[in-house]
């Protein structure tokens, strides 16, 4: 979409949804993509300013959700899906820290990258809890390839990864655990995050709540409190 058409597109959306019953929209692309439009005289900064100026028109009567979370859209949305939880670079020289989460928690809701796309769904779930993120999944209703073609082998890696029946039971259990730990912290500000010992992290909130996450294979005792191996524990 060329930048000069953004305002026209928003006017069209407002007209088409004027009598609709839903109260929210998802604006995916503007959250994950930001590009120049030199043909129409917009560099990336000017594109960001255009998006930031026009999005408030959509928030008058509706809530907005976006994907990934370009900063030019964050002030206008109430939820961000697929907020990154890992460093964009890999290697021993790089360590992931929840900088975005420390800034955003209590201001806007957010979810993780899809857990079923992770090489280690359990570890990714623990990171959700550590970072105050809602767990997220992306599924298909039918057994399909990523390209949409029906998969005859229902035990294939592709099918197992996205077919909803393979995940719904474990996902339901994880949602319940995350909800119990994080639900009443949605409006709380995250005040501190630290690695208190190798593989054990603590996230603190302005309510006084602390969440310990233990990624190691052994139970860990912290000031008389035992954090189970490969698990988390909330202390109020």
List each model region and its residues.
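Active-site-proximal substrate-binding groove within the catalytic cores of carbohydrate-active enzymes
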Residues: 1-236
């Amino acid at each position: 979409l060329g930048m000069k058409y953004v305002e026209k597109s928003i006017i069209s959306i407002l007209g088409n949804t004027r009598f609709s019953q839903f109260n929210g929209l998802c604006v995916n692309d503007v959250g994950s993509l930001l590009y120049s439009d030199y043909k129409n005289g917009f560099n990336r900064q000017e594109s960001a300013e255009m998006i930031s100026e026009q999005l408030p028109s959509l928030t008058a009567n509706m809530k907005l959700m976006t994907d990934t979370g370009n900063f030019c859209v964050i002030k206008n949305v109430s939820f961000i899906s697929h907020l990154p939880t890992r460093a964009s670079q890999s290697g021993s020289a790089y360590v992931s820290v929840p900088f975005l989460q420390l800034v955003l928690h209590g201001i806007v809701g957010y979810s993780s990258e899809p857990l079923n796309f992770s090489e280690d769904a359990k570890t990714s779930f623990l990171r959700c809890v550590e970072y105050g993120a809602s767990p997220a999944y992306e599924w298909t209703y039918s057994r399909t390839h990523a390209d949409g073609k029906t998969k005859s082998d229902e035990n294939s890696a592709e099918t197992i990864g996205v077919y909803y029946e393979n995940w719904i039971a474990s996902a339901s259990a994880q949602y319940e655990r995350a909800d119990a730990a994080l639900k009443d912290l949605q409006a709380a500000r995250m005040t501190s995050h630290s690695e208190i010992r190798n593989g054990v992290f603590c996230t603190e909130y302005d309510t006084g709540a602390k969440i310990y996450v233990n990624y190691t294979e052994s139970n860990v005792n912290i000031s008389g409190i035992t954090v189970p191996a490969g698990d988390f524990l909330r202390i109020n």
